[in-house]
C-alpha cells in the first residue's frame, strides 16, 4: 500500500518536472551567426534565459586569434559581446554570465588581410 502511494507521487513529480522543463525552454532565446571565407570560419552564438537570468555569448574564433593567424590586418578590428539587463555588461570574446540579463548581442567588425570589410552581428533577447 505504502509502495503504491510512493510510486504515484514519483509519477506525478515526473509529470510536473516535464511540464516545467518545457515551460522554461519557451523563455530562452538563442541566436547564431556564421561567416566562412578562404577557409576561415567565425561562428558566434548567444543565448539568453529570461527565467534564470543566465546569458552566454561565445565565439569559436577570437579577434586576437585572427590577428595571430594573419586573417585580420586592421588594428581597429574588434569583437563586442554585450549583455543587457539591469546593467550593461561588456563580455570578452567568450563568456558566461548569470545576472538579470534580458538580451545578449555580439558584434564582430574587422578588415581581412585581403582588405575586405566584414561585420557580423547576432543577438538573442527582448
Predicted features and spans:
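N-terminal prepro-regions of secreted/extracellular proteins
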Residues: 1-47
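Mature secreted bioactive peptide module from preproproteins
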Residues: 29-126
Amino acid at each position: 500500500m505504502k509502495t503504491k502511494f510512493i510510486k504515484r507521487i514519483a509519477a506525478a513529480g515526473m509529470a510536473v518536472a516535464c511540464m516545467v522543463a518545457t515551460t522554461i525552454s519557451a523563455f530562452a532565446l538563442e541566436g547564431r551567426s556564421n561567416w566562412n571565407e578562404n577557409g576561415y570560419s567565425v561562428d558566434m552564438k548567444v543565448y539568453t534565459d529570461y527565467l534564470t537570468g543566465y546569458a552566454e555569448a561565445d565565439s569559436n574564433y577570437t579577434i586576437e586569434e585572427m590577428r595571430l593567424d594573419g586573417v585580420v590586418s586592421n588594428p581597429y578590428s574588434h569583437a563586442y559581446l554585450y549583455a543587457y539587463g539591469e546593467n550593461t555588461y561588456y563580455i570578452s570574446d567568450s563568456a558566461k554570465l548569470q545576472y538579470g540579463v534580458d538580451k545578449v548581442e555580439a558584434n564582430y567588425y574587422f578588415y581581412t588581410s585581403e582588405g575586405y570589410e566584414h561585420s557580423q552581428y547576432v543577438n538573442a533577447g527582448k
